[in-house]
Design a protein with these regions (language model features):
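Hydrophobic h-region of N-terminal signal peptides that target proteins for export
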Residues: 12-19
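Intrinsically disordered, low-complexity serine/threonine-rich segments
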Residues: 9-11, 48
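Bacterial N-terminal signal peptides that target proteins for export
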Residues: 1-9
Length: 162
């Protein structure tokens, strides 16, 4: 093998090795996703901007609210958010914990503890604690968006009546 030919093979091999996807940086993506989720919780907690709140879900997202029909797609989710914001005394906030990622870093899920408040029949605030599981996808634009969102009640403490 001539030196020129060997050099060409080395150059092609090095160039091909550099063409693969960038390695997945778990720590960096964890920070980005937790920050994005915290921003979403703050926007939702303000209870004012339906479009901004809905923007954190993907166009093909599905939400499964406790005791209610499944909500599919951005338009239906936007309507769900608008309806929630219209409930007297409505307020929601959550905090998610450490995400778990797919091996390629394109999907993740997180658990969360949430608190929702609504006005009771006499106007007194009712606090409704909950828990949630969200599934996130990193879209082509590099932004994390929620693709599945489900929440329910935590278990009742031992000895308490519901």
């Amino acid at each position: 093998m001539t030196p020129v030919r060997f050099g060409s093979i080395v150059m092609v091999t090095l160039a091909a090795a550099g063409c693969g996807p960038a390695p997945f940086d778990r720590a960096a993506e964890q920070r980005k996703l937790l920050q994005r989720d915290a921003e979403w919780a703050d926007v939702a907690s303000a209870g004012k901007d339906v479009d901004k709140t809905a923007s954190y879900w993907a166009d093909d997202a599905v939400i499964i609210p406790q005791g209610q029909p499944i909500v599919e797609g951005k338009a239906a989710i936007r309507a769900f958010v608008a309806g929630s914001f219209a409930i007297p005394g409505f307020h929601v906030h959550w905090k998610s914990d450490a995400p778990e990622f797919s091996p390629d870093g394109k999907l993740a899920y997180m658990r969360a503890a949430n608190d929702m408040t609504v006005s009771g029949p006499d106007g007194t605030p009712l606090n409704l604690p909950g828990r949630a599981l969200t599934v996130w996808r990193k879209d082509a634009d590099g932004q994390w968006r929620c693709v599945a969102d489900i929440w329910n009640d935590p278990p009742q403490p031992a000895g308490s009546a519901k």
